[in-house]
């Protein structure tokens, strides 16, 4: 990729117009093959490794020919192989083709990203879930309604190929992409589906496909939006590999249903906020109920006319924004606005001004979290811990890891709250539920389990908590350190409890529209 960047710096126009010859460079597939071996060797035992893992470019050309002929005897998309030793060689060539295809398609996007980022020094990349809090500080004082939507995760392969034409001028280079997408759609696991479903597979090809698709949805919808100058937001023109979390906007594009996409006008409102976490974009609006209905209506029309998708009405729902509770990132978060007096003065105390502003004060919502824990069978409705019977068939390490993951994500998310008494109550529920689960598995008692495990129970989470506390109270000013908040930003994935809550909310919305 670095070599492609150097070539693109000299002549980026050539790279955009003539990408197809890159598919026939042997070194491209050699790099992809070596990358696959490096990744797969880390997950394979040493006795399975072979010194004969050499790449045959002739075999790669034959495989590409089979893909172009839509030969369904080949297997490019397999989640699990029943016999990895027998199919490892075949799988390595398939992965090399997908890796090489992704590298070629990334060339124009990488060049465009570098030039666009160099001209935008003010752009900042938010890679953490906790970039949601600057959004909350702007949203709560100025918004009264919210649109909760879901990005369509299914799309026809031909529509996806046509969207690539907006960035790639070399039409022949899109033929392999079209063949691969149709091959995936016609594979055994997707035989009954007429549209491609973007999966959550941690491969370079699917990650690039998903990032490009999300960026395309946002860039087209918000191509003429203007950001507020004082916003701490990410520039809209960033590479799709960067996750867009927060963007404050001034205008929203409206598409007329009567004239399809020919008539476009702007609806100006200085208090429209946009944020996305995963596949769930959220638009916070301050305005009349009619404005909210129009935004929801035009969002559905935009998807229907541009992506040729019929979006169910419940995929874009609107509701009044609560002033003391939010669940937009997939977590619950209670807040209260504390007024703060800010005094400013010039030199020699010539001028003094007192400004009153609001400070967001996050609170751990203990009641909703206990309700979710009760739904997932960690405790009863009153908060008394119970054993997780469905996990008793797992090993002790798996049980500890699952409880550790839930507690670590909850602690990292709510560790910046001023009042963490509710967080420690949740820790007590999870730790006792873990002990009861282990006791139920071994047909023993909690006392015996605690005696055997001792400090090993939640050892990883407790060590992170101690690091956090030592970091907080290492300041010289003890009084000020008690008011400091440090938000952790290393959450690798969303909490399973948040997914459970989101499913409950989706079912409620679907039932509401079915009535």
From Swiss-Prot:
Keyword Chloroplast in record: yes
Database matches in InterPro entries: Domain_X (IPR024937), Maturase_MatK (IPR002866), Maturase_MatK_N (IPR024942)
Subcellular locations according to the entry: Plastid, Chloroplast
The keyword tRNA processing appears for this protein: yes
Molecular functions per Gene Ontology: RNA binding
Superkingdom, taxonomy of origin: Eukaryota
Protein name as annotated: Maturase K
Organism: Pinus banksiana (Jack pine)
């Amino acid at each position: 990729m670095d070599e492609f960047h150097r070539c693109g710096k000299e002549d980026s126009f050539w790279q955009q117009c003539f990408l197809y010859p890159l598919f026939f460079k042997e070194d491209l597939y050699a790099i992809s093959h070596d990358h696959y071996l490096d990744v797969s060797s880390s997950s394979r035992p040493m006795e399975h490794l072979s010194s004969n893992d050499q790449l045959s470019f002739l075999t790669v050309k034959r495989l590409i020919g089979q893909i172009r002929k839509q030969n369904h005897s080949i297997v490019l998309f397999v989640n699990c192989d029943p016999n990895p030793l027998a199919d490892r060689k075949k799988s390595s060539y398939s992965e090399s083709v997908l890796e090489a295809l992704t590298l070629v398609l990334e060339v124009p996007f990488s060049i465009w990203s570098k030039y666009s980022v160099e001209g935008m020094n003010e752009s900042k990349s938010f890679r953490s879930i906790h970039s949601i809090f600057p959004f909350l500080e702007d949203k709560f004082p100025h918004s009264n309604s919210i649109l909760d939507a879901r990005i369509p995760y299914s799309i026809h392969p031909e529509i996806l190929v046509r969207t690539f034409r907006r960035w790639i001028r070399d039409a022949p280079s899109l033929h392999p992409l079209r063949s691969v997408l149709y091959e995936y759609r016609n594979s055994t696991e997707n035989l009954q589906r007429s549209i491609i479903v973007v999966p959550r597979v941690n491969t370079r090809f699917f990650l690039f496909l998903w990032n490009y698709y999300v960026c395309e949805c946002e860039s087209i919808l918000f191509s003429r939006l203007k950001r507020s100058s004082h916003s701490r937001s990410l520039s809209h023109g960033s590479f799709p590999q960067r996750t867009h979390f927060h963007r404050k906007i001034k205008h929203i594009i409206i598409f007329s249903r009567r004239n399809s996409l020919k008539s476009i006008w702007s609806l100006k409102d200085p208090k429209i906020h946009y944020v996305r976490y995963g596949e769930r974009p959220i638009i916070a609006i301050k305005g009349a109920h009619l404005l909210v209905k129009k935004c929801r209506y035009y969002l559905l029309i935009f998807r229907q006319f541009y992506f040729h998708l019929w979006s169910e009405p419940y995929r874009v729902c609107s509701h009044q924004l609560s002033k003391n509770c939010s669940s937009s990132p997939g977590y619950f978060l209670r807040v209260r606005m504390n007024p703060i007096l800010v005094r400013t003065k010039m030199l020699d105390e010539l001028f003094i001004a007192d400004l009153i502003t609001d400070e967001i004060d996050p609170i751990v919502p203990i009641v909703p979290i206990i309700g979710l824990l009760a739904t997932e069978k960690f405790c009863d409705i009153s908060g008394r811990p119970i054993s997780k019977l469905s996990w008793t068939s797992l090993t002790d390490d798996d049980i500890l890891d699952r409880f550790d993951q839930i507690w670590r994500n909850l602690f990292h998310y709510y560790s910046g709250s001023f009042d963490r008494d509710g967080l420690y109550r949740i820790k007590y529920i999870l730790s006792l539920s873990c002990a009861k689960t282990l006791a139920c598995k071994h047909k023993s008692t909690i006392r015996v389990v605690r005696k055997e495990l001792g400090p090993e129970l939640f050892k990883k989470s407790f060590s992170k908590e101690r690091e956090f506390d030592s970091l907080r109270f290492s300041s010289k000013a003890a009084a000020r350190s008690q008011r400091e908040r440090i938000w952790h930003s290393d959450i690798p994935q969303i909490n399973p409890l948040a997914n459970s809550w989101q499913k409950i909310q989706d079912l409620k919305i679907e039932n509401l529209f079915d009535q």
